[in-house]
C-alpha cells in the first residue's frame, strides 16, 4: 500500500506566502476601479481670480484633499465655464458641456450654478428665471442618460458679500440688487434636489458675510482662502454622505 506523503507544515506556510506575494506583485492583479467626479459650474468652479486655477481652484484642491485622506481611486475633472448659466437662454451656458460627458462618464457630478442667473440687463438672464427649474431638471436628466447610476450633488450659489473690501459704489449697487436673487435660487435649488432625488449642498449660508474669503473689489468670487474653504465644504459633504468611499 502506498502511503500519502504530506508536506511539512513549515513548507506549506512558505508556499502559501509565496502565492500571496505572487498575487500582490503580479501585473495581472485587479486594481480598484477609478471613479470619476465631474465638477460642473461657472467661473467659481473654473477658479476665476486665482493666479493658478489649475492647482488652486476648488476642484483641484478637492482632488488633493481626497488623495491626502486616502481616497485614492478618484479622478476629478474641472468643467467650469466663466459666465455660464444652467439656463438654456444664457450665453454661455452649461449645456455645451454635455457633449463631453460621454467621453468621461462621471460616477459623481457636482453642479454649482446660479450666480450668473441673477444678472439682468443687458444679459437678461433673470428675466428668464421662470425657466430655471425646467432647465435644471432637464440637465439632470441628460446627465443620467450618460450614467443612470451617477450620484448628483447640486449646490446653491455662494452668497454675494457686500462688505468685501474696496468695492466700488457701482459694484455695491449691483450686488445689492442681485443678492436677494441668490437666496431665492437657494430655495429653488433645494426644491429641485428634492424633486429630482439628488443631493443638495448649501453653499450660500456658509459664505454669508465672509468678506475675508472674497476677492477684493469683487464680492462674488472667492480669494485663495475662499476657494480652499469651498473645497473643504464639498469634501466634507461628500465624505459625510458617503458619496466617496475608500
Which ranges hold each PLM region?
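Hydrophobic alpha-helical membrane context
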Residues: 25, 54, 235-237
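Sec-dependent signal peptide cleavage junction
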Residues: 29-35, 181, 246
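Conserved SGNH/GDSL esterase-like catalytic core that processes O-acyl groups on lipids
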Residues: 34-39, 44-134, 221
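Bacterial Sec-dependent N-terminal signal peptides
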Residues: 1-34
Amino acid at each position: 500500500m502506498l502511503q500519502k506523503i504530506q508536506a511539512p507544515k513549515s513548507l506549506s506556510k512558505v508556499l502559501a506566502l509565496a502565492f500571496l506575494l505572487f498575487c500582490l506583485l503580479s501585473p495581472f492583479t485587479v486594481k480598484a476601479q477609478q471613479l470619476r467626479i465631474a465638477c460642473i459650474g461657472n467661473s467659481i468652479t473654473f477658479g476665476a481670480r486665482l493666479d493658478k486655477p489649475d492647482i488652486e481652484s476648488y476642484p483641484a484642491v478637492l482632488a488633493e484633499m481626497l488623495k491626502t485622506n486616502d481616497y485614492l481611486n478618484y479622478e476629478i475633472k474641472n468643467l467650469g465655464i466663466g459666465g455660464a448659466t444652467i439656463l438654456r437662454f444664457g450665453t454661455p451656458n452649461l449645456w455645451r458641456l454635455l457633449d463631453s460627458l460621454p467621453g468621461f462618464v462621471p460616477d459623481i457630478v457636482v453642479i454649482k450654478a446660479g450666480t450668473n442667473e441673477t444678472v439682468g440687463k443687458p444679459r437678461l438672464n433673470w428675466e428668464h428665471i421662470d425657466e430655471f427649474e425646467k432647465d435644471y431638471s432637464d440637465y439632470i436628466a441628460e446627465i443620467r442618460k450618460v450614467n443612470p447610476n451617477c450620484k448628483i450633488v447640486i449646490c446653491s450659489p455662494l452668497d454675494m458679500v457686500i462688505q468685501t473690501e474696496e468695492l466700488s459704489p457701482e459694484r455695491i449697487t449691483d450686488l445689492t440688487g442681485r443678492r436677494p436673487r441668490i437666496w431665492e435660487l437657494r430655495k429653488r435649488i433645494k426644491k429641485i434636489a428634492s424633486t429630482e432625488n439628488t443631493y443638495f449642498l448649501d453653499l450660500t449660508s456658509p459664505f454669508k458675510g465672509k468678506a475675508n474669503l472674497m476677492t477684493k473689489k469683487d464680492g462674488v468670487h472667492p480669494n485663495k482662502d475662499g476657494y480652499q474653504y469651498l473645497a473643504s465644504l464639498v469634501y466634507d459633504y461628500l465624505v459625510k454622505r458617503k458619496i466617496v468611499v475608500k
